[in-house]
Regions:
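Solvent-exposed soluble domains appended to multi-pass membrane proteins
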Residues: 83-93, 101-104, 109-384
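N-terminal secretory/membrane-targeting segments
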Residues: 1-97, 117-138, 172-177, 181, ...
Length: 384
Protein backbone atom coordinates (compact mmCIF):
# COMPACT_ATOMS: atom_id res chain seq x y z
CA UNK A 1 0.00 0.00 0.00
CA UNK A 2 2.80 2.41 0.90
CA UNK A 3 4.57 1.64 -2.37
CA UNK A 4 1.36 2.31 -4.33
CA UNK A 5 0.82 5.64 -2.58
CA UNK A 6 4.40 6.72 -3.31
CA UNK A 7 4.06 5.57 -6.93
CA UNK A 8 0.82 7.50 -7.35
CA UNK A 9 2.39 10.63 -5.87
CA UNK A 10 5.46 10.31 -8.08
CA UNK A 11 3.24 9.85 -11.13
CA UNK A 12 1.20 12.87 -10.13
CA UNK A 13 4.33 14.95 -9.66
CA UNK A 14 5.67 13.78 -13.02
CA UNK A 15 2.41 14.66 -14.78
CA UNK A 16 2.34 18.09 -13.14
CA UNK A 17 5.96 18.67 -14.12
CA UNK A 18 5.26 17.72 -17.74
CA UNK A 19 2.17 19.95 -17.85
CA UNK A 20 4.06 22.83 -16.23
CA UNK A 21 7.04 22.57 -18.58
CA UNK A 22 4.78 22.23 -21.61
CA UNK A 23 2.58 25.09 -20.49
CA UNK A 24 5.58 27.28 -19.75
CA UNK A 25 7.17 26.57 -23.11
CA UNK A 26 3.93 27.23 -24.98
CA UNK A 27 2.81 30.32 -23.06
CA UNK A 28 6.17 31.97 -22.46
CA UNK A 29 8.69 30.74 -25.03
CA UNK A 30 6.42 30.92 -28.09
CA UNK A 31 4.16 33.56 -29.65
CA UNK A 32 0.99 31.61 -28.84
CA UNK A 33 -0.37 34.31 -26.51
CA UNK A 34 0.30 37.23 -28.86
CA UNK A 35 -0.98 35.26 -31.86
CA UNK A 36 -4.33 35.03 -30.09
CA UNK A 37 -4.73 38.78 -30.01
CA UNK A 38 -3.22 39.71 -26.66
CA UNK A 39 -1.47 43.04 -27.00
CA UNK A 40 0.40 44.08 -23.87
CA UNK A 41 0.40 47.87 -23.77
CA UNK A 42 3.71 48.96 -22.29
CA UNK A 43 2.61 52.59 -22.15
CA UNK A 44 -0.35 51.63 -19.95
CA UNK A 45 0.20 48.02 -18.78
CA UNK A 46 -2.53 48.28 -16.12
CA UNK A 47 -5.14 48.52 -18.88
CA UNK A 48 -3.85 45.29 -20.43
CA UNK A 49 -3.87 43.49 -17.08
CA UNK A 50 -7.47 44.56 -16.52
CA UNK A 51 -8.49 43.46 -20.01
CA UNK A 52 -6.66 40.13 -20.34
CA UNK A 53 -5.89 39.09 -16.76
CA UNK A 54 -2.72 38.76 -14.72
CA UNK A 55 -1.60 35.31 -15.86
CA UNK A 56 -1.77 36.05 -19.60
CA UNK A 57 -0.06 39.43 -19.26
CA UNK A 58 2.60 38.12 -16.89
CA UNK A 59 3.55 35.25 -19.20
CA UNK A 60 3.64 37.65 -22.15
CA UNK A 61 5.89 40.05 -20.25
CA UNK A 62 8.36 37.24 -19.47
CA UNK A 63 8.68 36.47 -23.18
CA UNK A 64 9.32 40.14 -23.93
CA UNK A 65 11.89 40.57 -21.17
CA UNK A 66 14.46 38.28 -22.79
CA UNK A 67 15.50 39.40 -26.31
CA UNK A 68 16.66 36.63 -28.60
CA UNK A 69 20.26 36.64 -29.77
CA UNK A 70 20.39 37.78 -33.44
CA UNK A 71 21.41 35.18 -36.01
CA UNK A 72 25.14 35.24 -36.62
CA UNK A 73 25.89 37.46 -33.64
CA UNK A 74 29.16 37.08 -31.77
CA UNK A 75 31.67 39.38 -30.11
CA UNK A 76 34.27 38.23 -32.63
CA UNK A 77 31.99 39.28 -35.51
CA UNK A 78 31.44 42.68 -33.92
CA UNK A 79 35.18 43.23 -33.53
CA UNK A 80 35.70 42.14 -37.14
CA UNK A 81 33.21 44.73 -38.40
CA UNK A 82 34.44 47.58 -36.20
CA UNK A 83 38.10 46.95 -37.05
CA UNK A 84 37.48 48.40 -40.52
CA UNK A 85 36.78 51.84 -39.07
CA UNK A 86 39.04 54.37 -37.43
CA UNK A 87 38.03 57.21 -35.16
CA UNK A 88 38.00 60.69 -36.64
CA UNK A 89 40.59 62.91 -35.05
CA UNK A 90 39.34 66.21 -33.67
CA UNK A 91 41.51 69.27 -33.27
CA UNK A 92 41.44 69.91 -29.51
CA UNK A 93 41.87 73.63 -30.13
CA UNK A 94 38.91 73.88 -32.49
CA UNK A 95 35.79 75.40 -30.93
CA UNK A 96 33.01 72.86 -30.82
CA UNK A 97 29.51 74.00 -31.76
CA UNK A 98 26.52 73.98 -29.46
CA UNK A 99 24.20 71.08 -30.33
CA UNK A 100 20.41 71.28 -30.09
CA UNK A 101 18.54 68.06 -30.93
CA UNK A 102 14.79 68.20 -31.50
CA UNK A 103 12.58 65.16 -31.99
CA UNK A 104 9.22 66.67 -32.82
CA UNK A 105 6.10 64.73 -31.87
CA UNK A 106 4.46 63.17 -34.97
CA UNK A 107 6.36 65.54 -37.27
CA UNK A 108 6.21 64.29 -40.86
CA UNK A 109 5.39 65.30 -44.42
CA UNK A 110 2.37 63.28 -45.62
CA UNK A 111 3.18 64.05 -49.25
CA UNK A 112 5.16 60.79 -49.16
CA UNK A 113 1.83 58.96 -48.89
CA UNK A 114 0.03 60.56 -51.81
CA UNK A 115 -0.51 63.75 -53.78
CA UNK A 116 -2.06 65.99 -51.14
CA UNK A 117 -3.37 69.43 -52.07
CA UNK A 118 -3.87 71.99 -49.30
CA UNK A 119 -5.07 75.58 -49.12
CA UNK A 120 -1.51 76.67 -48.25
CA UNK A 121 1.90 75.20 -47.51
CA UNK A 122 1.81 73.59 -44.07
CA UNK A 123 5.56 73.92 -43.46
CA UNK A 124 6.86 76.71 -45.72
CA UNK A 125 9.88 77.56 -43.56
CA UNK A 126 11.12 73.98 -43.21
CA UNK A 127 10.47 73.18 -46.88
CA UNK A 128 12.52 76.23 -47.90
CA UNK A 129 15.25 75.47 -45.36
CA UNK A 130 15.65 71.92 -46.65
CA UNK A 131 15.74 73.13 -50.25
CA UNK A 132 17.76 76.34 -50.03
CA UNK A 133 19.11 76.64 -46.51
CA UNK A 134 22.50 75.99 -44.97
CA UNK A 135 21.75 72.44 -43.93
CA UNK A 136 22.01 68.72 -44.50
CA UNK A 137 18.57 67.22 -44.99
CA UNK A 138 16.76 64.16 -46.21
CA UNK A 139 14.59 61.23 -45.19
CA UNK A 140 14.97 58.97 -42.19
CA UNK A 141 12.94 55.92 -41.24
CA UNK A 142 11.26 55.46 -37.88
CA UNK A 143 10.62 51.95 -36.60
CA UNK A 144 7.08 52.89 -35.56
CA UNK A 145 3.89 54.56 -36.80
CA UNK A 146 1.57 56.58 -34.60
CA UNK A 147 2.96 55.63 -31.21
CA UNK A 148 5.75 54.29 -28.98
CA UNK A 149 7.69 57.52 -29.31
CA UNK A 150 10.34 56.40 -26.83
CA UNK A 151 11.66 53.82 -29.30
CA UNK A 152 12.69 56.54 -31.73
CA UNK A 153 14.36 58.32 -28.82
CA UNK A 154 16.17 55.10 -27.89
CA UNK A 155 17.46 54.56 -31.43
CA UNK A 156 18.53 58.18 -31.87
CA UNK A 157 20.24 58.55 -28.50
CA UNK A 158 21.98 55.15 -28.34
CA UNK A 159 22.68 54.25 -31.97
CA UNK A 160 21.00 50.89 -31.36
CA UNK A 161 18.24 49.42 -33.51
CA UNK A 162 14.81 48.23 -32.45
CA UNK A 163 15.13 45.57 -35.16
CA UNK A 164 16.84 43.27 -32.65
CA UNK A 165 14.23 43.68 -29.92
CA UNK A 166 10.83 41.95 -29.72
CA UNK A 167 8.00 43.61 -31.64
CA UNK A 168 5.86 45.89 -29.52
CA UNK A 169 8.41 46.41 -26.76
CA UNK A 170 9.69 49.73 -25.44
CA UNK A 171 13.40 49.72 -24.70
CA UNK A 172 13.19 52.45 -22.06
CA UNK A 173 10.82 50.30 -20.02
CA UNK A 174 12.18 46.79 -20.47
CA UNK A 175 15.86 46.84 -21.34
CA UNK A 176 17.43 50.05 -20.03
CA UNK A 177 18.41 49.06 -16.51
CA UNK A 178 22.02 50.27 -16.30
CA UNK A 179 24.02 53.24 -17.57
CA UNK A 180 24.46 52.97 -21.33
CA UNK A 181 26.83 54.71 -23.76
CA UNK A 182 24.91 57.28 -25.77
CA UNK A 183 25.09 60.49 -27.74
CA UNK A 184 24.90 62.26 -24.39
CA UNK A 185 27.87 60.49 -22.82
CA UNK A 186 29.88 60.99 -26.01
CA UNK A 187 29.27 64.74 -25.98
CA UNK A 188 29.98 64.95 -22.25
CA UNK A 189 33.33 63.28 -22.86
CA UNK A 190 34.05 66.07 -25.35
CA UNK A 191 33.42 68.71 -22.70
CA UNK A 192 29.79 69.60 -23.43
CA UNK A 193 27.71 71.18 -20.68
CA UNK A 194 23.98 71.55 -20.21
CA UNK A 195 23.26 67.98 -21.22
CA UNK A 196 19.59 68.55 -20.49
CA UNK A 197 16.49 66.73 -21.71
CA UNK A 198 13.15 68.52 -22.07
CA UNK A 199 9.82 66.75 -22.40
CA UNK A 200 6.95 68.79 -21.02
CA UNK A 201 4.69 65.93 -20.04
CA UNK A 202 4.68 63.45 -17.16
CA UNK A 203 8.24 62.41 -16.36
CA UNK A 204 7.27 58.79 -15.73
CA UNK A 205 5.78 58.29 -19.21
CA UNK A 206 7.77 55.52 -20.91
CA UNK A 207 10.01 55.46 -17.83
CA UNK A 208 11.83 58.60 -18.99
CA UNK A 209 12.54 59.74 -15.43
CA UNK A 210 14.74 56.66 -15.04
CA UNK A 211 15.91 56.19 -18.64
CA UNK A 212 17.24 59.71 -19.26
CA UNK A 213 19.72 59.68 -16.34
CA UNK A 214 20.96 56.23 -17.42
CA UNK A 215 21.71 57.72 -20.84
CA UNK A 216 23.80 60.44 -19.23
CA UNK A 217 21.48 63.45 -19.01
CA UNK A 218 22.29 65.71 -16.06
CA UNK A 219 18.88 67.42 -16.04
CA UNK A 220 15.38 66.45 -17.09
CA UNK A 221 12.77 69.17 -17.46
CA UNK A 222 9.17 67.98 -17.42
CA UNK A 223 6.03 70.06 -17.03
CA UNK A 224 6.49 70.27 -13.25
CA UNK A 225 10.01 71.76 -13.12
CA UNK A 226 10.31 73.66 -16.41
CA UNK A 227 12.01 77.06 -16.20
CA UNK A 228 9.61 79.04 -18.41
CA UNK A 229 5.83 79.55 -18.12
CA UNK A 230 3.73 76.63 -19.35
CA UNK A 231 1.86 77.56 -22.54
CA UNK A 232 -0.45 75.02 -24.11
CA UNK A 233 -2.13 74.39 -27.44
CA UNK A 234 -5.07 72.06 -26.99
CA UNK A 235 -3.94 70.26 -23.81
CA UNK A 236 -0.24 69.99 -24.64
CA UNK A 237 2.77 72.25 -24.22
CA UNK A 238 3.50 74.20 -27.39
CA UNK A 239 6.70 73.71 -29.33
CA UNK A 240 7.49 77.35 -28.58
CA UNK A 241 7.22 76.70 -24.86
CA UNK A 242 9.59 73.75 -25.26
CA UNK A 243 12.12 75.73 -27.30
CA UNK A 244 11.99 78.60 -24.80
CA UNK A 245 12.89 76.12 -22.07
CA UNK A 246 15.96 75.07 -24.06
CA UNK A 247 17.14 78.62 -24.76
CA UNK A 248 16.65 79.62 -21.12
CA UNK A 249 18.66 76.59 -19.99
CA UNK A 250 21.34 77.58 -22.50
CA UNK A 251 21.40 81.14 -21.14
CA UNK A 252 21.72 79.84 -17.58
CA UNK A 253 24.71 77.74 -18.60
CA UNK A 254 26.34 80.79 -20.14
CA UNK A 255 26.37 82.51 -16.76
CA UNK A 256 28.90 79.98 -15.48
CA UNK A 257 30.74 78.52 -18.48
CA UNK A 258 31.53 79.09 -22.14
CA UNK A 259 31.91 75.36 -22.85
CA UNK A 260 29.80 74.01 -25.74
CA UNK A 261 26.18 73.34 -24.84
CA UNK A 262 24.01 70.29 -25.58
CA UNK A 263 20.25 70.33 -25.23
CA UNK A 264 17.76 67.65 -26.28
CA UNK A 265 13.99 67.78 -26.48
CA UNK A 266 11.10 65.51 -27.29
CA UNK A 267 8.17 67.83 -28.03
CA UNK A 268 4.51 67.05 -27.29
CA UNK A 269 2.41 69.68 -29.11
CA UNK A 270 1.36 67.52 -32.07
CA UNK A 271 0.29 64.41 -30.16
CA UNK A 272 -2.91 62.66 -31.28
CA UNK A 273 -5.87 62.66 -31.43
CA UNK A 274 -6.69 64.79 -34.46
CA UNK A 275 -10.44 65.20 -34.23
CA UNK A 276 -11.21 66.95 -30.92
CA UNK A 277 -11.96 70.70 -31.15
CA UNK A 278 -10.33 73.18 -28.73
CA UNK A 279 -10.89 76.88 -28.22
CA UNK A 280 -7.13 77.54 -28.19
CA UNK A 281 -6.42 75.85 -31.54
CA UNK A 282 -7.51 76.63 -35.11
CA UNK A 283 -7.98 73.11 -36.48
CA UNK A 284 -8.99 74.35 -39.94
CA UNK A 285 -5.96 76.51 -40.57
CA UNK A 286 -4.85 73.92 -43.11
CA UNK A 287 -7.51 72.24 -45.25
CA UNK A 288 -6.92 69.19 -47.45
CA UNK A 289 -8.69 70.11 -50.67
CA UNK A 290 -8.45 66.95 -52.76
CA UNK A 291 -9.37 64.31 -50.20
CA UNK A 292 -11.91 63.59 -47.48
CA UNK A 293 -9.44 63.71 -44.61
CA UNK A 294 -10.45 66.20 -41.93
CA UNK A 295 -8.17 64.58 -39.34
CA UNK A 296 -5.23 65.07 -41.71
CA UNK A 297 -6.12 68.76 -42.08
CA UNK A 298 -6.33 69.04 -38.29
CA UNK A 299 -2.89 67.42 -37.99
CA UNK A 300 -1.36 69.65 -40.68
CA UNK A 301 -2.72 72.70 -38.88
CA UNK A 302 -0.60 71.63 -35.91
CA UNK A 303 2.40 71.18 -38.21
CA UNK A 304 1.90 74.73 -39.51
CA UNK A 305 2.32 76.03 -35.96
CA UNK A 306 5.36 73.78 -35.48
CA UNK A 307 6.93 75.22 -38.61
CA UNK A 308 6.56 78.79 -37.34
CA UNK A 309 7.89 77.93 -33.89
CA UNK A 310 10.89 76.09 -35.30
CA UNK A 311 11.67 79.20 -37.35
CA UNK A 312 11.78 81.14 -34.08
CA UNK A 313 14.32 78.67 -32.67
CA UNK A 314 16.48 78.98 -35.79
CA UNK A 315 16.32 82.78 -35.64
CA UNK A 316 17.36 82.76 -31.99
CA UNK A 317 20.59 80.92 -32.78
CA UNK A 318 21.12 82.89 -35.97
CA UNK A 319 21.53 85.89 -33.71
CA UNK A 320 24.11 84.33 -31.39
CA UNK A 321 27.85 84.59 -31.89
CA UNK A 322 28.51 80.98 -30.94
CA UNK A 323 28.61 78.22 -33.56
CA UNK A 324 25.48 76.13 -33.18
CA UNK A 325 24.04 73.05 -34.89
CA UNK A 326 20.33 72.23 -34.70
CA UNK A 327 18.95 68.80 -35.58
CA UNK A 328 15.25 68.24 -36.29
CA UNK A 329 13.27 65.12 -37.09
CA UNK A 330 9.95 63.49 -36.18
CA UNK A 331 9.45 60.46 -33.98
CA UNK A 332 6.92 58.88 -36.36
CA UNK A 333 4.09 59.65 -38.75
CA UNK A 334 0.68 60.37 -37.20
CA UNK A 335 -1.91 57.65 -36.93
CA UNK A 336 -4.69 59.03 -39.11
CA UNK A 337 -7.97 57.27 -39.79
CA UNK A 338 -8.01 54.40 -42.30
CA UNK A 339 -10.73 56.25 -44.22
CA UNK A 340 -8.39 59.22 -44.63
CA UNK A 341 -5.64 56.92 -45.88
CA UNK A 342 -8.16 55.48 -48.35
CA UNK A 343 -9.01 58.97 -49.58
CA UNK A 344 -5.45 60.22 -50.11
CA UNK A 345 -4.23 56.97 -51.72
CA UNK A 346 -7.45 55.92 -53.48
CA UNK A 347 -7.45 52.87 -51.25
CA UNK A 348 -4.16 51.62 -52.69
CA UNK A 349 -2.36 51.60 -49.32
CA UNK A 350 -4.31 48.52 -48.27
CA UNK A 351 -2.52 46.53 -50.99
CA UNK A 352 0.94 48.04 -50.67
CA UNK A 353 3.79 45.55 -50.61
CA UNK A 354 6.49 45.73 -47.94
CA UNK A 355 8.60 48.22 -49.88
CA UNK A 356 5.63 50.50 -50.55
CA UNK A 357 4.52 50.27 -46.91
CA UNK A 358 7.88 51.75 -45.92
CA UNK A 359 6.38 55.09 -46.94
CA UNK A 360 4.42 54.97 -43.67
CA UNK A 361 7.71 55.08 -41.78
CA UNK A 362 9.34 58.01 -43.59
CA UNK A 363 9.96 61.25 -41.73
CA UNK A 364 12.06 64.23 -42.81
CA UNK A 365 15.18 65.37 -40.99
CA UNK A 366 17.50 68.34 -41.22
CA UNK A 367 20.75 69.48 -39.64
CA UNK A 368 21.17 73.26 -39.74
CA UNK A 369 24.14 75.33 -38.65
CA UNK A 370 24.60 79.05 -38.14
CA UNK A 371 27.97 78.80 -39.92
CA UNK A 372 28.91 77.47 -43.34
CA UNK A 373 28.63 73.70 -43.79
CA UNK A 374 28.56 71.44 -46.83
CA UNK A 375 24.93 71.35 -47.92
CA UNK A 376 23.71 67.96 -49.11
CA UNK A 377 20.63 65.79 -49.39
CA UNK A 378 20.53 62.30 -47.87
CA UNK A 379 18.14 60.01 -49.73
CA UNK A 380 17.49 57.74 -46.78
CA UNK A 381 18.94 56.82 -43.42
CA UNK A 382 17.74 55.35 -40.13
CA UNK A 383 17.15 56.86 -36.71
CA UNK A 384 20.17 55.15 -35.21
Amino acid sequence: PVFKKVSHRLCGIAVMAIVSVTGFSQLVMTDMVSNRGLYLSLFNPMRSYQQYGSIACFTRSIKLSVPEKPNGYSLKKVEEITSKYTSDTVDPNKKRPNVIAVINEAFSDPQVLGDIETNEDYMPFIHDLMKNGNCVSGTTYASIVGGQTANTEYEFLTGNSMAFLPKGTVAFQLYLRHAMPSLVTELKSEGYTGNSATHLQKARNYNRDKAYPLLGFDKFYDYTNMIVPFVKMRNNATDQCTYDNITHDYEQQRKSTDAPYFGYTMTIQNHSSYDVPFDNFDDKRIVVENADATDLGYYLSLIKYSDEMFENLINYYKNTDEPTVIFLTGDHQPRIHDESMDSITNGEWRNWNDEEMMRRYEVPFLIWANYDIDKKTVEKTSMN
